[in-house]
Amino acid sequence: MDKFKRDGEEYISYQRRFLYPLLFQEDLYAIAYDHYFNRSSCFEPMENSSSNDRFSFLTVKRLISRIHQQNDLIISFLNCDQNPFVGHNSSFYSELVLEGPTVVLEVPFLMRSKHSLEKKNEWKSFRSIHSIFSFMEDKFPHPNSISDMRIPHSIHSEIFIRTFRRWVRDAPSLHLSRSVLHEHRNSSENLYKSILIAPEGNTKFFLFLWNYYAYECESLLVPLRKRSSHSRLLSYGAFLEQIHSYRKIEHIVIFSRRNLAKSIWSLKDSSISYVRYGERSIMALKGAHSSVRRWRYYLSIFWRCYFHFWSQPYRIRIDELSNNCSSFLGYFLGVRMNTSVVRIKMLDDLFITDLITNEFDSIAPIIPLIGLLAKERFCDISGRPISKLAWTGLKDDDILDRFDRICRNIIDYYSGSFNKDGSYRMKYILRLPCAKTLACRHKSTIRVVWEEFGSELFTKSFPKEGELISPFFSKTCSQRKRIWHSDILRINLPANFWQNKRNRQIETLFGL
């Protein structure tokens, strides 16, 4: 494919028109098998693997021949209950066949991404969960409102095909994708005849659909064409992993195509900071309340016209920071006033005044954290500690290690919040459950456990207040600065928990 990079037109023509023959190459399914095996091995222990999951290229070759004869055969193949061809291991091969078209569809997507990144990109973009902390540390001169959005994830299957046709001109590949999507739509589980996609998709195919769909949803924030925008030229760089993203746009004026004279959106004085985790996204806006409401109208019109569905009102909510806070991934986001003493000397006079500035701040919620510990049976709803009876059969070191990991996860996750007392309060709540669990294991009392293990018990398991993992920062510095720990394995777990909890609250509130 490198030879087609010399000529742009010929290169684009190749990547759009000749994808379907790749479906019948055995090497493609070898790559798909490697992707499937690597992903499965990360979540499944070795003792659960079976010899029945062995891969057979002969079976794949027969499937390729059948797909080559008629595309409709993939529909009967994807139905594992009615497909005796591959035997008892049909589920394994059905997922593998979905991996193959995904690898093919990723070819133009990767080329499109690389072609966009070769251009000058003036955006500051980050693609990991740590971009959320950069968002919380960002400087907002005058943040007035926060728009809490939830990206719709119920899309008609034909909408994906129509969006694919804009950059994939290979008709057989589109027909094959349509067959797969329509078969999924017509299954008994999808009563509304739509495709439910989410960032935590269990297959590579639906994860690719989410990445592409998120890219299309976020493209509305960018002035893609000069005729529809009048601003400093910003090139939009496509990215493959779109589970997490961070965008910041400044000084945008958006024009309507119908009537430029009357439909000018006065957003040139607004500053937008955008962050997304999964299907939830946050935009911090400044400006008048009417200007902020126009953004919600803009998003609703875009979803209705581009994806052909009505956006529910609960998916876009605007909170004014001056009145209340907004919750995102277990943090309360609000504005905190920072007062600075300024001395002004003019000739012989010295004036002292207070300079008040607003800072965008994150707060650790105390009551939800207590509710989280109560759900895991570490305390009751009032915060009174109780013993973990299920762990009494473990060794002392295992019990201490489990409590240590839980405490470390909470402290690391809220290490950069303004009120660090909330995370340290969770530490003291976990002290007594640890002691009670050890007391139940040894059939003694908490006093006996304390005398036996001594004060080193909690000193070893729990860090002291103000203690940092990194030795490069002093204790005085940690009290003044907010330091985010970058252990992504520990951070992702609380983030996913708060994300799912927030989604359930919204669905319960609106009777979904």
Curated annotation (Swiss-Prot):
A GO CC term?
chloroplast
Its chief place of residence is: plastid
Compartments annotated for it: namely:
Plastid, Chloroplast
Matching InterPro entries:
Domain_X (IPR024937), Maturase_MatK (IPR002866), Maturase_MatK_N (IPR024942)
| Gene Ontology biological process terms, A to Z | mRNA processing; RNA splicing; tRNA processing
Q: Which domain of life is it from?
A: Eukaryota
Q: List the disulfide bonds.
A: none
GO MF annotations in UniProt: RNA binding
Supply the alphabetized keyword list. Answer: Chloroplast, mRNA processing, Plastid, RNA-binding, tRNA processing
Family of this protein: Belongs to the intron maturase 2 family. MatK subfamily.
Q: What does this protein do?
A: Usually encoded in the trnK tRNA gene intron. Probably assists in splicing its own and other chloroplast group II introns.
Entries under PANTHER family matching the protein: MATURASE K (PTHR34811:SF1)
What this protein is called in its record is: Maturase K
